Amino acid sequence: MKIGKLNSIVIALFFKLLVACSIGLVERTNAALESSSKDLKNKILKIKKEATGKGVLFEAFTGLKTGSKVTSGGLALREAKVQAIVETGKFLKIIEEEALKLKETGNSGQFLAMFDLMLEVVESLEDVGIIGLKARVLEESKNNPINTAERLLAAKAQIENQLKVVKEKQNIENGGEKKNNKSKKKK
């Protein structure tokens, strides 16, 4: 009888310890991700400030036009966009790592919180002229709520794919020479 009671106490204590460790891990993960998100947003603001110093007039951006056709400092603007994309990629990698850690034990609230951090970061990209990304990601999430690691990773992949397209448009690899692929020949 005493051994059964002792076993019950040991099991209860073990369970409480396991829950406490799990909660501590989740809190540390959230704090680390929030800190990383804040750092990235600060880096994006720094990138914008540096580009402004190189002659980019971000105030010239219109609702849909955020390229060198509406502002000065074309190469500096394209470099700023690429720098912001590279830094965002690092943050998205951290999100992926944490999502995979929580894949089995995480709950929908945790994945949604991580998604919200991704949206905040994507929104901060608008400061350097990368617009419309948040709206596209939100539209997709309406059909597939972000409540699992798989859906969070799918949203992350969508962001990465769209950022890849923006990065390729900047054409930095070719010495900054911007080519216009549209043919203006008329027959």
From Swiss-Prot:
Signal peptide positions on this chain: 1-20
Coiled-coil intervals, chain numbering: none
Pfam family, one: Decorin_bind
Record-annotated membrane-spanning stretches: none
Keywords, alphabetical: Plasmid, Signal
Keyword Calcium: no
Family: Belongs to the decorin-binding protein family.
Chain's role: Binds to decorin which may mediate the adherence of B.burgdorferi to collagen fibers in skin and other tissues.
Protein name: Decorin-binding protein B
Source organism per UniProt: Borreliella burgdorferi (strain ATCC 35210 / DSM 4680 / CIP 102532 / B31) (Borrelia burgdorferi)
Taxon lineage: Bacteria, Pseudomonadati, Spirochaetota, Spirochaetia, Spirochaetales
Name of the encoding gene: dbpB
